């Protein structure tokens, strides 16, 4: 099974950069997009809804031009869930989940903690609730793949120039500790399972020439670690300030 994920920084903007033909040529079984900044019904191009995929969108209830997630599924899921049951966050359109018999795939956009548009205290509040949720579902007899823009990096090798800067977005002590705790408690970074030493980056918050950070990944149940066959970051084309992450798993939905 191939899972592709990307923070698009606006679906229609990314489409104007060539996203649509590229993304549907990657032979992905699941495509997770974040920060779509649109409603499903505002997308005017038919090419965004190929017959080979079932498309699902979660919009910001109050303003669809903010946040938003999407999942494209080659095989129809058993169920689709919007939100995580977090009363302060579900209306923001930051989580969408596809359930299959033994596997759940989520498309997640962690609230930004970067000023001027983000608030670190809000982000940390969301992460606190997410941690409790992930620990609760960890014991379920199913595997989880959470694709998204986490806006966090854990190790120095995941942040370019980490030794020279103290203001790297997503690289605060609190955020790194949160990820470290998650990885000790039954979850793993799918990219690092396949590429333990590869210094790749997925987000350039200050533009193409700025230092990169690997904040985009697929966080998986520990039980899936042995199923990760390969992982890559695609940088040949630019669709947004983020790069697509592609992971192949030795599993069947």
Residue positions per predicted region:
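N-terminal, active-site-proximal structural segment of metallo-dependent hydrolase catalytic domains
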Residues: 1-48, 61-66, 253
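Active-site-proximal beta-strand elements of phosphoester/diester hydrolases
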Residues: 1-9, 102-114, 147
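Catalytic metal-binding/acid-base residues of hydrolase active sites
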Residues: 9, 36-37, 109-111, 151-153, ...
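Structured beta-strand-rich core segments of catalytic domains in phosphoester-bond hydrolases
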Residues: 36-113
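Metal-dependent phosphoesterases centered on the DNase I-like endonuclease/exonuclease/phosphatase
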Residues: 51-54, 126-211
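Conserved beta strand-loop-helix elements of the APE1-like EEP
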Residues: 64-80, 206-227
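Surface-exposed cleft-lining segments at the edges of enzyme active sites
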Residues: 84-86, 110-127, 163-167
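Surface polyanion/phosphate-binding segment centered on an Asp-His-Pro turn
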Residues: 234-253
């Amino acid at each position: 099974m191939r899972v592709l994920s990307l923070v698009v920084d606006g679906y229609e903007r990314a489409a104007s950069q060539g996203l649509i033909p590229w993304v549907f040529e990657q032979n992905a079984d699941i495509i997770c997009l974040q920060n779509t900044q649109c409603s499903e019904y505002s997308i005017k191009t038919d090419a965004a809804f190929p017959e080979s995929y079932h498309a699902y969108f979660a919009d910001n209830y109050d303003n669809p031009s903010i946040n938003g997630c999407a999942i494209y599924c080659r095989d129809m899921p058993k169920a689709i869930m919007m939100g995580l049951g977090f009363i302060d966050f579900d209306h923001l359109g930051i989580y969408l989940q596809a359930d299959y018999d033994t596997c759940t795939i989520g498309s997640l956009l962690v609230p930004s903690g970067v000023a001027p548009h983000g608030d670190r205290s809000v982000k940390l509040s969301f992460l606190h609730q997410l941690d409790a949720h992930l620990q609760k579902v960890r014991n379920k007899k199913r595997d989880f793949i959470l694709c998204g823009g986490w806006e966090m990096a854990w190790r120095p090798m995941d942040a370019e120039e980490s030794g020279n800067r103290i203001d790297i977005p997503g690289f605060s002590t609190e955020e790194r500790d949160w990820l470290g705790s998650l990885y000790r408690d039954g979850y793993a970074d799918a990219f690092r399972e396949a590429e333990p030493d590869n210094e790749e980056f997925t987000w350039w918050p200050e533009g193409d020439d700025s230092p990169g950070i690997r904040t985009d990944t697929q966080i998986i149940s520990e039980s899936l670690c042995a199923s990760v066959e390969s992982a890559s970051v695609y940088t040949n084309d630019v669709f947004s300030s983020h790069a697509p992450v592609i992971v192949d798993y030795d599993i069947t939905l």
